[in-house]
Amino acid sequence: MNQMNPAFVMPDVQSTVDTRQIPIQRVGVKAVRHPLTVRTESGDVQPTVGVWNLDVHLPADQKGTHMSRFVALLEESREPLTVERFRAMLASMLVRLEAEAGRIEVTFPYFVNKTAPVSGVQSLLDYEVTLAGESRNGETRLFLKVLVPVTSLCPCSKKISQYGAHNQRSHVTIDAELAADLPVEALIRIAEEEASCELWGLLKRPDEKFVTERAYENPKFVEDLVRDVAQRLDADERVVAYVLEAENFESIHNHSAYALIERDKRHAA
């Protein structure tokens, strides 16, 4: 059986010099599944599972990065995730990897306990959330992205029909660059309040009647939906820039209706 010589020093190959002199903008680990807890708007802690991407800039003269340090960072980051905690993780990663620039991104399911509009029955609804941060040239930028399922009802269908109108489930995706802490629930509310109607996980018959009539009284094209959400984001000082998308999974077509608005308030006229 081979035994390692106590005097033997294992070579650190990735720290050797690379003679090709080509920098790598982003190198790290991708699609790492790891449990985490998230601090909710009410202050509660919600357990979930995140899919993490972590990477750093690699100088031209360095052969490789230290891949194990990315996972070690996740293992040691057990505190509930907040925007400020995420910022601290990003700074810690740069120190650990001795890097001048880097990025962390995590996507996870986030659950909100919702109360049905008439019966009051409670149920959970899931949302896809992504928190991302990047640091470069001493500047750190943080991004919060939420995918919110809603209901949309077609104004044209309502106008031309003697009764009824076609409606469908839609996705509103808000990818916001943050100037200050912004709860996930705040972005969810903006999307839901500007849709024809929001969704619930569990509805009784009186609730279903409410949802049907609410959507009928509040018809919106996909263009209306993105413009109304954009107005809300424009008025929120916690958001400095955003990419906003809406996709209607049309119930009378085998394709979707789609709209996008992108705006950086720092460069707005």
From Swiss-Prot:
Keywords carried by this UniProt record: Hydrolase
Site (May be catalytically important): C154
InterPro entries: GTP_cyclohydrolase_FolE2, GTP_cyclohydrolase_FolE2/MptA
UniProt-listed Pfam families: GCHY-1
Family of the protein in this entry: Belongs to the GTP cyclohydrolase IV family.
GO molecular function, one term: GTP cyclohydrolase I activity
Function recorded in the entry: Converts GTP to 7,8-dihydroneopterin triphosphate.
Transmembrane parts of this sequence: none
Chain's gene name: folE2
Record-listed E.C. numbers: 3.5.4.16
Identification of the protein by name: GTP cyclohydrolase FolE2
